[in-house]
């Protein structure tokens, strides 16, 4: 089955066209600057060179038309479309076929993720209307966390506030964490009942997974919570918002921008949100970069222990996403701060670069540590195949 996976943002639209059975990626790309001057499509076919096609993309409808036009060059029919949805709210315990009802849900919960859900809902509607013969599936990033125990998702706020505004932990990166569990389980079977999946990219979250079920995760109502990220501050005292507003004179919108776009590794290092630049700075003695790394290791190890505690133990730790898959130094930094839990990496194995899932801990490590490249598009395509198959 051939599936087109779409990941729409407010001014961008990423796509990947792949075969679920062979995992072959026929083509992938992204439409950038939709609705803004200078829009273009970056497109790659069968691992070939990336082409930049400068086209006017006044809206998402035009972008989708372009994507379908470009994909005509691929000699394979589109059998289904999978839509990544950032926030499924209290509605989606799993992926679902697009209907008037499910599309309505995506819009209803959009105030929780306004930058993403509105655009995603529009794109889903456009695809459904333009290509009525192709099945469309909604794959919410929160669905995997839906069944977290109540003691993990409930916020200790007044019940009527929680109920009226649906303020609770929803988590994010669920599709990636689900893929990591699936892969680790395929490789390790019953040796892993309790996994902490560590998705460390420009956005970062940990997820405690026991026998395939999410027990807790570090992101909360929104993807701002938890770990220190590229430009996001992660968990801080919530009163900071009130204080900055009342005493600092910052508006709520300014604080929102500050905490999401101007904080995290970027703010602490004063150099970059990219871990490669920060590692480089730290190596040449930049103290701010050294502190950014130290804080990243400290918080990641601390929250790892929190995730382990939610399962009363942990068998396997899996690193994934941009930092988790590529930075041996960051993996080592986190693992060093977990030596008290019996985590020990094999330095040689940790240094290996590969696209394959692999073990990087020593045989006597109390927790098996792995690197597992994530593949959210494939996971989405699998859901499409299951629901349409
Ligand atoms: P992601 O959001 O998963 O695409 O991850 C993006 C982040 O991963 C970048 O901002 C970098 O900090 C980090 N990253 C990507 N590639 C590498 C690499 N080769 N070495 C170290 N860090 C990397």
Residue ranges, per PLM feature:
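Short beta-strand-loop/turn "lid" adjacent to the catalytic site in phosphate-handling enzymes
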Residues: 71-116, 135-137, 143-152
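Short glycine-rich, Thr/Ser-proximal phosphate-binding strand/loop in the N-terminal lobe
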Residues: 3, 12-56
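Glycine-rich phosphate-binding loop of actin/hexokinase-like ATP-binding domains
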Residues: 144-247
């Amino acid at each position: 089955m051939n599936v087109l996976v779409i990941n729409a943002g407010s001014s961008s639209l990423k796509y990947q066209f792949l075969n679920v059975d062979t995992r072959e990626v026929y083509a992938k790309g992204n439409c950038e600057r939709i609705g803004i001057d200078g829009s273009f499509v970056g497109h790659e076919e069968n691992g070939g060179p990336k082409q930049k096609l400068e086209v006017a993309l006044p809206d998402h409808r035009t972008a989708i038309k372009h994507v379908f036009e470009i994909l005509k060059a691929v000699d394979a029919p589109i059998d289904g479309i999978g839509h990544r949805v950032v926030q499924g709210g209290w509605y989606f315990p799993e992926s679902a076929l697009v209907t008037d009802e499910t599309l309505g849900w995506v819009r209803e919960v959009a105030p929780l993720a306004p930058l993403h859900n509105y655009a995603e809902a529009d794109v889903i509607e456009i695809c459904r209307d333009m290509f009525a013969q192709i099945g469309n599936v909604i794959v919410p990033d929160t669905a995997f966390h839906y069944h977290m125990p109540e003691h993990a998702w409930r916020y200790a706020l007044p019940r009527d506030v929680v109920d009226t505004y649906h303020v609770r932990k929803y988590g994010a990166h669920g599709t990636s964490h689900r893929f990591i569990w699936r892969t680790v389980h395929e490789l390790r079977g019953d040796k892993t009942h309790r996994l902490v999946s560590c998705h460390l990219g420009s956005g970062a979250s940990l997820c405690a997974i026991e026998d395939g079920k999410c027990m807790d995760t570090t992101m909360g109502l929104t993807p701002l919570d938890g770990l220190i990220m590229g430009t996001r501050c992660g968990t801080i005292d919530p009163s900071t918002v009130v204080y900055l507003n009342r005493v600092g004179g910052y508006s709520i919108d300014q604080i929102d921008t500050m905490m999401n776009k101007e904080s995290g590794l970027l703010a602490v290092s004063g150099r970059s949100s990219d871990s490669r630049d920060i590692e480089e700075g730290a190596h040449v003695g930049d103290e701010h970069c050294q502190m950014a790394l130290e804080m990243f290791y400290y918080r990641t190890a601390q929250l790892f222990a929190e995730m382990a505690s939610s399962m009363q133990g942990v068998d396997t730790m899996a690193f994934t996403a941009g930092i988790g898959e590529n930075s041996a130094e960051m993996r080592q930094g986190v693992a060093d701060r977990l030596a008290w839990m019996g985590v020990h990496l094999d330095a040689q194995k940790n240094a290996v670069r590969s696209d394959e899932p692999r073990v990087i801990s020593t045989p006597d490590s109390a927790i098996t540590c792995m690197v597992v490249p994530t593949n959210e598009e494939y996971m989405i395509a699998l859901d499409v195949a299951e629901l349409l198959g």
